[in-house]
Amino acid sequence: PNSASEISDKIGHIMCYGDGWYGGVYVGAMYSLAFISNDIQYIVEEALKTIPIESTFYQCISDVIKWHKQYPDDWKQTWFELQKHYSEEVGCPDGVFVPLDIDAKINAAYIVLGLLYGNGDFTKTMEISTRAGQDSDCNPSSAGGILGVMLGYSQIPEYWMQGLRGAEAKKFKYTSLSLDDLYAISYRHALLMIEKNGGTVFDNQVMLPIQKPTAVRLEQCFEGVYPLVKKGLNCTDIDT
C-alpha cells in the first residue's frame, strides 16, 4: 500500500489535494491489499492506516466501519447516517447547502459501504455501492475492481462478464487502445512495480513484498472556509 501511496502523491496532486488526494491513496491501498487478503473487513480497515487519523476523511471512513458493526444487517441505516453527517460539503459548489456532494470522502464511504455489506458477493457489492448514489458509476467500479482483485478475473460472475467480453477488443473513441490493450499495459506496469519495490517475478507467478501501511501527511481541504450565501449569476447581473 505504501508504494501505491507514493504514486497517488504524484498523480493525485495534479488536480486534487486533501480529501481528493486521500481518496486515491485509500482506494489504491485497498487494491494493493486485495492481492494478499480475502478478508474484506481487513482490507477496508488496514487500508485506512494510510490516511492521517486527524483528517475528516479518516473520520468519515471510520464512521462507516463503526456503523456497519452497529447495523450489520441494514446498509440503508448506515447510508442514512452518512447522509446526516457527510452529505453537504463546502468544497462542492453545486452542492453547497443541498444534499449533493461529489467530495471524495462520501464517495469513498459508498465504496466501503458496498464492500462491507456486500461481504464478498459481487452482485450485492455492486448493487449497494450503486444505489448509494452520488458518483454512482465510479463508486461501484472501484468496489467491483477491489473485489475483482480479491476474487480473481475468472471468479467474476458470468452475469457481469456478458457485456464486458463483447467490449474488450473495441478501441476507445479517439484512441488506438482497447480494454485488452490496457490490460496488457497495466499488467506490464504491475510487474515492473513489483520488481521495483522488492518483489520477484517468475515465469507464471510473482512474490509480493508485504508492507505495513503508514499514513501519508496531513492535508486538509478548505480549512476555515464556509460559504455565507449561494448565488447564481447570469448576463443581467454583469455590468458591461
Model-derived regions: residue spans:
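Acidic, carboxylate-rich catalytic segments that either coordinate divalent cations
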Residues: 54, 58-101, 150-240
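Flexible glycine-/small-residue-enriched beta->alpha junction loops
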Residues: 1
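Catalytic phosphate/nucleotide-handling subdomain of diverse soluble enzymes
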Residues: 15-19, 26-27, 106, 110-193
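Flexible, glycine/charged-enriched surface loops at secondary-structure junctions
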Residues: 18-22, 38-43, 57-61, 139-140, ...
